[in-house]
C-alpha cells in the first residue's frame, strides 16, 4: 500500500477504516510511512500529534517496540525546535498505555489464578501436586510468564526508549526526570532488580555523554542550579529504590554518583542538599556496620546543618564513642585483609569530602573542640565523662547501667549499645593486662555484668578475646581447666600501642624497648648540667645554624618569587592551550555531529526505500501465493491433490498441474497393488500360525513364574540374615552403653539442679526489681497529678485575670468607638446641611435664569411677529411674474439684492430673517444676535 499523500485528517481516517476492518498491521504501516516521510519533517507539531497518538496506540496494541522507537525518534527530530509540549504529550501517552496494558495483564492473570482454585479451604496433597504436573495445569507462575512477562518486557523497553529520546535535552529536562522516577517506581513495584541495575547504568551513560557533548544544541548545562538539582533529585530517588530493593552495591554506586555531581558542580551545594546527602550516608554506613565512617558522616552532617542541633549533637558524640577500638585497620602484621580495609575506608572517606580516613580519637577531639558536647543531653555527657575521662575498670559497668537503660528507651539510640559494650570490654582488658598477669574468668564476668538483654555469657567473652588476639589488640590466653585467663608478657615482643586506651603503667616489654632511650636522656641531662664545654658547644652550634638560616632566607625568597612567576607563566600558557584545544574539540564535535546527522538521514532514507521495496516484493509474493492457493483448491476439488501450505511459496501453476498428473499415476499404482495383496491374503495362514503358538506361550509363562519364585525366596533369605546380624550388633551396643547410664543421669540431675537454683535466684531478683519499680511509678504518678492540679489552679487564676483585663480593654474600645461615631455623625450632618443650602442657592439661581430666558423669548417672539407682518404687507400677489425686469415688486439684476450677498429667486431668506416660533428652543448664539 502506497503511503497516503493527503492531509493528517485523511491519514487518520484511513487508519481508522483499516482498524475497523481488523487490519491493525496495515494501519500501523500506513501511519509509520507517513511519519518517516521527508516532507513530514517540516510539518507542525500540532498537525502530527494526532497521527503520533494513533501510531503509539497501534504500536502498544501490536507490541511493536522497535517501530515505536523509530517513529518517536523521527517525530522528535521533526518537532523539537517548534513544539516541545507535543513530544512530552506523546511520550507520556506511550508510557501510560504501556502501564495500562501491564495492569490489565496482571488483573487477568490474577483472575485466572482465582478461577483455577475450586476450593479455597482445600490443602495441597501429593496426589494433587502430581496430577497437576501430569495434566499440565497452569500455575500462577506459568500464568504470569504467559500473560504478564511479555507486557513487562514491553514496558521496560518503552522506558528505555523514552529515556534515550529525552536524554541530554535542556527543553525536555522535566519530562526526563518524571520518566526516570516512573521507571524507578516500576522497578520497585515489580521487584525488577536486574532492570534496575541496567536503568542505573543507562542514566550514568546519559550523564557521561552530557559532559562529552556539552557544546551540542539544546544540551543540558550542569552548572545551572535547577538542572543540577533535578539530577541530584533523580540520584536520591535512585538511592532510595536501591535501598528498598536491598541492592547495596547499587546504593553505594548511587552515593558515588551523587558525590560526582556535587564535585562537578562549580557552585557550592546548598546546606539542605548536603544534609540529605550525609543523612543517606549515615544510614548506609550503619547498615554496613562501618561505625567509623558512620560517626564521620554524623560529624559532617552536624557541620553543614543546624536543624535539631541538640538531637544531632547526641548522635555525633554517641556514634564517635561507639567506634570499635579493635579495628580491621590495626591487624597485626601485613595482611591482605588489612590493606583491603584501608583502601576501602579511604575510598569511602572521599564520599565524605575527607582527604584521609579519620580515626576514633580525631573524631572525638574534633567534636569536643567544636563544643558539640555542650549541646548534648546530660546522659550523653555523663557517658563521655565515664568512658573517656574517668574510666575505671572495677566500676565502669555499674556507672554505665543507668545510661544504657536511657539509651534503650529509643530505637535510634539502642542500636549503639552493642558497639559501646565492645569498646568497654576492649578498654577493660587493655587495662587489666597492665595490672594483672592472670585473673579468673568469673571475676571478669562480674566486672562486665550488664542487665538483660545486654548481658554477656562466657562464650561471648571468649569469642571477643579471640577476635582481639587475632587483630593484635590483646595477648591473652584462656585456661579452661582453671577457668582463668592469663596475660602474656614477652619481654622482647613489640609493645601494643593504642592511643584510645589509658596507660596505667609501663609494661615490661615497653621498659625493655625504651631502655636505650631513657639512658640517652639521662646522659644528655648530666652533660647539660656538669659539662660547660658541651653547653658552650651546643650554644655555638645553635648560633651558627641561625646565621646560616638567616643568610639563606633572602636567597630562598628570590627562588620562591622566580618559581611563582614561572608557575604563573606556565599556567597562562596552559590556559591558552586548553582554550585552543577546547575550541578544536568543539569544532570536531560539531563536524562529527553534522556527519552523524547526515548519516542518520541517509540511513533513514535507505531504510524507507528498502521498506518500500520489501513491501512491493511482499505484495507480489502475496498475489502469486493467492493464485497458487486458488489453483490448489481447484485441483483438490477435482483430483483430490493435497498441497502443504509451506510448499505453496515455491510452486506455480505449471508445477501444480505436473503434481496433479503425478498424483493420479500414484493413485492408480496404489490401487493395483492393494488389489493384488488382498487376493493373496484370502487364505487362513496367519490364523493357523497363531493357534500353533498358543501352547508355546503358555509353557514360557510357567517357566518365567518358577524362575521369579526362586529369586524371591533367595532374596528373602538374604534379607533375614542381614536383619539378624543388625539385631545382634544392636544388643551388644546396648549392653556397652548401659555401663554409663548412671553417670549420664547424675550429670543431668546436677545440671537441672543448677538451672533450677539460678532460676529461683533470678526470679526473686526480678520480683524485687518489679516491686521497686511499681513503688517508684506510683510515687511519680502521685507527684505528677499534684503538680498538674497546682498548674491548673495557676492557669485558672491567670485566665480570670486575663479575662478581666480583656473586659476593661473592651469597654475602653467601645467608649472610643462611640466618640468616633458621634464626631462622624456631626460631621456628616454639617456636610448634609451645607449641601442642602448649596442646592437651594443653585435652585434660586436656576429660577432667576429661567425667568430671564422666558422674558427674552417673549420679546423676541413679539419682534418676529412684527417683522412677519411687515413682510406680508410688501410681498407680491400670488399671480405676479417673478422674473426680474420692470414689473412691479420685482428686483432687477442690477439691484443690490441680486448680488452675491443677497438671495436668488426661489431661495430661502437668510437665517436672521426667520424668527423662531413661540416656545421653540433658541441657541445662545442666536440669542445674542437677536438681542443686538
From Swiss-Prot:
The keyword Protein biosynthesis applies. The modification Phosphoserine is found at residues 374, 501, 874-875, 877. It is found in: Cytoplasm. Residues 793-932 are annotated as: Disordered. One of its GO terms (cellular component) is eukaryotic translation initiation factor 3 complex. GO terms for molecular function: mRNA binding; translation initiation factor activity. Residues 793-865 have a biased composition (Basic and acidic residues). Residues 309-492 form the PCI domain. Keywords: Coiled coil, Cytoplasm, Initiation factor, Phosphoprotein, Protein biosynthesis, RNA-binding. The keyword Coiled coil applies. Pfam families: eIF3a_PCI_TPR-like. GO terms for biological process: formation of cytoplasmic translation initiation complex; translation reinitiation. Residues 877-893 have a biased composition (Low complexity). PANTHER family: EUKARYOTIC TRANSLATION INITIATION FACTOR 3 SUBUNIT A, EUKARYOTIC TRANSLATION INITIATION FACTOR 3, THETA SUBUNIT. RNA-binding component of the eukaryotic translation initiation factor 3 (eIF-3) complex, which is involved in protein synthesis of a specialized repertoire of mRNAs and, together with other initiation factors, stimulates binding of mRNA and methionyl-tRNAi to the 40S ribosome. The eIF-3 complex specifically targets and initiates translation of a subset of mRNAs involved in cell proliferation. This is Eukaryotic translation initiation factor 3 subunit A. It comes from Schizosaccharomyces pombe (strain 972 / ATCC 24843) (Fission yeast).
